[in-house]
Amino acid sequence: MGDVLKAYFVPNGSYLMEMAEDGDKVSAVETLQGIGREIRDVLRPDATTMASPHWLPRSAFFVDDSAQHESFNDYPLRPAPFGRRFFSYSAAGDPVLARAIVASAREAGVPVGTKVYGLDHGAFCPLKVMDLGGIPTVPVSTSRRSFDECVRWGEAVRRAAQSAGRRVVVISPGNLTHRLDLRGDDERESYLPLGAKFDQIMIDLVTSGRSADIATIDPEMLREAAPEADGRPLYFLAGVTGHARGELLQYQGMKYSVGDATFAFEPAAAGVAR
């Protein structure tokens, strides 16, 4: 019987691939690797659905229904003296699941289309660190559409897993505070004080099953913290999981003022939501 087995909110910075390659003992990397083992060895899904926070069209939501997906390098490289590193990733697709997502969204009145897109680093970085190359994946966009539509988009993805008879793990990367504009050589290890406060509010919302209530946060704080994609990855997950509570697996206020958090979600029973 098809359904979403589990869902995850994970970090997606390209630095995670470097840390994993170097064997660094960093909580974000070790947690991603642990999730990868759980997906491969315990959950054993038919496919994953990956919603990159960097694929942000305005007109609609999109699905890549290709039979094969290749990564492309859209992330900034470090200056050559510090050792530039290119990474790549390939994964089989699942056109049947992809088409089911499109049909499910259309039936719900969610604007949707197909597009050959591939895997940007928001998608392939966590997939590579989790080592999920042997599992088919369906890349789907996030979107600049309304928060309500992002929730409905998540609901459509879950219904599609059910109708297609696919056992699916959904991964929606992002960061809490996301102020990369503050990076600088003199503050590489610092963290924005407001970011720590904002991140705790976000953690409290997600762990209490209120991921879709981000807009209730003070508007000025939201503007200053600038969560990745305005928090849309978490609205999407609220739809996917029936507003399930998220379990915080790790959190760190990273250098460059990034709130680096990982959550796992056990979806509510089909048809059950808060």
Language model: regions and residue ranges:
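Flexible, D/E/H-enriched segments
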Residues: M1-D46, P57-E155, R183-R274
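Beta-strand elements within well-structured catalytic alpha/beta cores of enzymes
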Residues: A7-V10, D46-S52, V140, R166-L176
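Non-transmembrane, aqueous-exposed alpha-helical and coiled segments at domain scale
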Residues: E155-S163, V168
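A structural signal for small-residue-enriched, beta-sheet-centric alpha/beta enzyme cores
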Residues: L176-R179, G184
